[in-house]
């Protein structure tokens, strides 16, 4: 109950701040631009296929593979750079405003505080996901995309967003500066989402260890990219769902440990 109260308060605070509207505006404009560009590219490919009478290729053309999957995949990458602005003040603002001590000395548990912050951020990314869902839904009016793949892609975007919110809560808990929290979250997300497998592959290649090694496979599991790719293709696996749940739990537990340590200082 305390967690929901904190979540409601934080979510209202987010939507009062101009940062939320800047993020949502940028998110909507970028999404609209990417979707329109993808749609134009798809129409041009279809016209070329019709021009050369490549009927088999036209029949095999899939809206999900050619349009929806690349669109949601692109927005996942954009998320890495916008989400830190949403999460940077979730905990650090309490420290900067001097209200952290009030929270720590209240009967509210540390876990309620962490969970409340996380739920507030999750509520915000739900709105972001709903904005993205609007664009693929338009295709159902004029075409026949696969509903299962479309829903899987949107659920994937929501799950990875919630995982990144947990990362942001952790980064925000280690500092009183929102700027530092922003930078730290950005670095962690870029590493987790994009750079980690690449850096490990380079390191292992230099040491003569193959990509099939245990280390490489472990890093591939830790990085979000492989899990996102599978779900965008409509392949929903319990291992991928477990990954998002475990990753979120780990960063929330780390956040709890950091905040709890402040109580005993």
PLM feature spans:
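Hydrophobic alpha-helical transmembrane segments of multi-pass membrane transport/permease proteins
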Residues: 18-46, 77-82, 188-193
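Long, hydrophobic alpha-helical segments
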Residues: 67-93, 128
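Aromatic- and glycine-rich beta-strand/loop motifs that create alpha-glucan
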Residues: 1-24
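Transmembrane helix boundary and interhelical loop/hinge segments in multi-pass membrane proteins
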Residues: 84-104, 118
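Terminal transmembrane helical anchor/hairpin motif
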Residues: 38-65, 184-258, 263-265
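A structural motif at transmembrane helix-loop-helix junctions in multipass membrane proteins
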Residues: 19-22, 158-190, 196-206
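Secretory targeting signals
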Residues: 32-36, 59-73, 115-180
